Amino acid sequence: MDIRCVNWFENKGETKYIYLKAINRESNVIFIRFNYYYHYVYDASKELEYKPNECIDLGPFKIINIDEKLSTDIRYVEPRNYYTSELVLVKDLKRNREKQYLQEYLDITWFYLLNNITPDGCYKIDIEHLTPIKKDCYHCDDVSKVFIQEIPIFEVKFTYLLFDIECQFDKKFPSVFVNPISHISCWIIDKVTEYKFTLINTDILPDKEPSILHHKDFSPKDRITYCTEIVMLLIMKKILEHRFDFVITFNGNNFDIRYISGRLEILEKSFIYFSLPDATETVKLKIFERFVTGGTFTNKTYHINNNNGVMFFDLYAFIQKTERLDSYKLDSISKNIFNCNVAIKEIDDTILTLEATVKDNSKDKLSIFSRVLETGNYITIGDNNVSKIVYKDINQDSFIIKVISNRDYEIGSVHNISFGKDDVDLKDMYKNYNLEIALDMERYCIHDACLCKYIWDYYRVPSKINAASSTYLLPQSLALEYRASTLIKGPLLKLLLEERVIYTRKITKVRYPYIGGKVFLPSQKTFENNVMIFDYNSLYPNVCIYGNLSPEKLVCILLNSNKLESEINMRTIKSKYPYPEYVCVSCESRLSDYYSEIIVYDRREKGIIPKLLEMFIGKRKEYKNLLKTASTTIESTLYDSLQYIYKIIANSVYGLMGFSNSTLYSYSSAKTCTTIGRNMITYLDSIMNGAVWENDKLILADFPRNIFSGETMFNKELEVPNMNESFKFRSVYGDTDSIFSEISTKDIEKTAKIAKHLEHIINTKILHANFKIEFEAIYTQLILQSKKKYTTIKYLANYKPGDKPIRVNKGTSETRRDVALFHKHMIQRYKDMLMKLLMESKGQQEITRLILQSLETDMISEFTHNREFEKYLLSRKHHNNYKSATHSNFELVKRYNLENTEKIEIGERYYYIYICDISLPWQKKLCNILSYEVIADSKFYLPKDKRIFYEIYFKRIASEVVNLLTDKTQCMLFFSRLFGTKPVFSSD
């Protein structure tokens, strides 16, 4: 039999088993049970106090102590301790045995490695060597006899349950103790057919009789079933206990499933149960919480404790982890991914006829949108015009819809439409609840259930799950849950076993700070000439590979008391550990009593971390090449997911070296990596800053050299193609792995040509070994506000005459989600004005005067005439990591949640606005501004006796504008006159 592995799971009882859920070519499910063993690695000579189930000789391993020892005298540098020992792997049924080596690795990873199993692989199995237990469930005692060979991946049909519920409520958020469920909409996708249906509660519809009286009378073929809430809950109990491959919800683990389970217990004293495929264990549905701390907030995820092989997948938690959005409500996510362009074909009073074709959209975008349109009831035109759909005509490459809208539009105009929030107020609907409203709500509910599948398909979640499972050697149900420090353990254990190396530590890990990447100060604020951008390719991974930065390759760490001692010690240590066999790097000291430290790495044999990185980079290249030749959709989606997973994990290695809780923790390796990275970007800056292209010669600012040996590689003067013109180069900024080089021309075509020549010269004459740079782009009209904040017009590296540039805002207020739309528009306008005045060669004093004059006029006009509040909305993320338990932000949300049904959850962004009494005149002095904050939800409107507190917004805008200008005197006078204070000027 040919099978595809789709999930692995364990039972909850004391006698542990591993279960494989597999699907054969006929899309039938089989379960295979394996004995669960705990794995312990010992020296072969060690006498055990217990009799293990099995001992496996691993052979000789190099045991390396990777504790970092500090030396203060070069004469007494201690060599790294290691020895070779014969090891044995013990498999035992009991946990918590004494462990000697490799204790931090997961038992399931050992299972995969020892049996040479890929978690998501396809295999030819010999069913004769399996022992039948129950129908479609077998026990396996000998994996090698059952799993005959791995075969190419084949497609199987998964089964799905997607559902959404609506609960009756009045003012507050629904309570499981008080509020009944009014609707449950489901989409069941089976091997052969699909069912879309809704259960409607007749207990709250007195004029409607139930269509069934018992849950056994239910048929999923009926589009709508009317029944009592108890019957509805018993139907869902049976459905949820069924062994689907996936149960997909949006925040269902926290709300929908919890609510159904709670109502079932309250009304019927019944519970949802899950059973193992071998029927040896049954568990009651429980929801457990897992906390993930990151940044400024703690994120909580919810998980179902099932044991039946079903993957309960919460799209809400998945998207929170993978996307950076203003809001993680279903309508916001839908709006973000399901959108297209339409042309207005006809306007008949309030009815708009909209047409979408391949002329204004890609085929993929149109196809995805059309699919969602099948169940959609409302679309959003532009940012906020929610319009009801009254007619649909969906074709293969186009669609026509008619919507109701009171807004003014022009025939022929093109607009972006999206699936956002349906324009329904559930609270009002329940207030006037009847059969007609119940049916209207049903359309809303079934659409939300279907949206889960559309989002699932859009993100290609199964492909991502399988790619992660295969790469990290984890069960599919866990592959997307863990953090990088756990995910790396599978590939690392595999490599350690292959290389026959084991790391040990005797000293407790100590966390020290270290300096990160080099960020140059901007040389000035604005640039009229073009700026070329050059990036190092995978700088940190390549630094680790070249320097052989791996904990077992660390030779010594020498502390220096002062600069003179540092220089003397460096000369001595380089003679003792010569390049290229070794690399000696001077870094900042980890101890405050010392001036610096010299770290030495042995490059003679490749270390574990460089091998790990080369494997990840090589695998990514392999899958990118396979992606180009993929012949089926399943292959292309899998290879794309795999290359992406390998990119992510390769980039995470450097971070894990500096993370004390990681298996890969190596403080010296992380610090040396960033030090070499800073040296590489500084070296490139020294070569390019002041270089000149004179006709057919390039005169560099310094001699190209090997930064590790100091050896000069080429002359400063290099031959280049004759441009019959001279160009000067000046470094104006740099950040970690990229350098911004200004060229003395405004001609895009010439700049692109020269930059490509420079890329080749830098890679062949200036850099060496595996270090390479790439010409990324040309920036024109660059405004460098400060470190990591700039605005520019960007031309791509492969520029051809006629290509249109794009505007780029990086780190500026235009890209920040906590900045008001009005602020963004104003800053963009004044940056455009600044560049225009610079191109006109106006003087700095004149530029400052004109901009401040215009800014004051605009602010006075806005203060006098505006009543639109939407463009003044700000947003922030709700979290509970404030130092004070009564922080004003937290209290603001707390008060809002007490009064509103749509609660703001931890980790979610919300909008707020500053408003004050309309009678309040212009306020020069702003005090206690937090007291003027009001949360602005979808129903918010500006009260007649209030005005926007413009002064708060204007002061922030003015602060940013004056930091773009050079005449500080004019700026201070302007600020004092309008706001009664001096502006704060940026120091970088």
UniProtKB/Swiss-Prot annotation:
Species this chain originates from: Fowlpox virus (strain NVSL) (FPV)
Coiled coil: none
PANTHER family: DNA POLYMERASE CATALYTIC SUBUNIT, DNA POLYMERASE DELTA CATALYTIC SUBUNIT
Domain of life: Viruses
InterPro entries: DNA-dir_DNA_pol_B, DNA-dir_DNA_pol_B_CS, DNA-dir_DNA_pol_B_exonuc, DNA-dir_DNA_pol_B_multi_dom, DNA-dir_DNA_pol_B_vir_insert, DNA/RNA_pol_sf, DNA_pol_palm_dom_sf, DNA_pol_type-B
SUPFAM superfamilies per the UniProt record, alphabetical: DNA/RNA polymerases, Ribonuclease H-like
PROSITE patterns xrefs: DNA_POLYMERASE_B
Family from the record: Belongs to the DNA polymerase type-B family.
Protein name: DNA polymerase
Swiss-Prot/TrEMBL catalytic activity: DNA(n) + a 2'-deoxyribonucleoside 5'-triphosphate = DNA(n+1) + diphosphate
EC number: 2.7.7.7
Task performed by this protein: Catalyzes DNA synthesis. Acquires processivity by associating with a heterodimeric processivity factor comprised of the viral A20 and D4 proteins, thereby forming the DNA polymerase holoenzyme. Displays 3'- to 5' exonuclease activity. Might participate in viral DNA recombination. Does not perform translesion synthesis across an abasic site.
GO-annotated biological processes: DNA replication; viral DNA genome replication
Gene Ontology molecular function: any one: nucleotide binding
Record note on quaternary structure: Interacts with A20. Component of the Uracil-DNA glycosylase(UDG)-A20-polymerase complex; A20 and UDG form a heterodimeric processivity factor that associates with E9 to form the processive polymerase holoenzyme.
Alphabetical keyword list: DNA replication, DNA-binding, DNA-directed DNA polymerase, Nucleotidyltransferase, Transferase, Viral DNA replication
Class of this enzyme: transferase
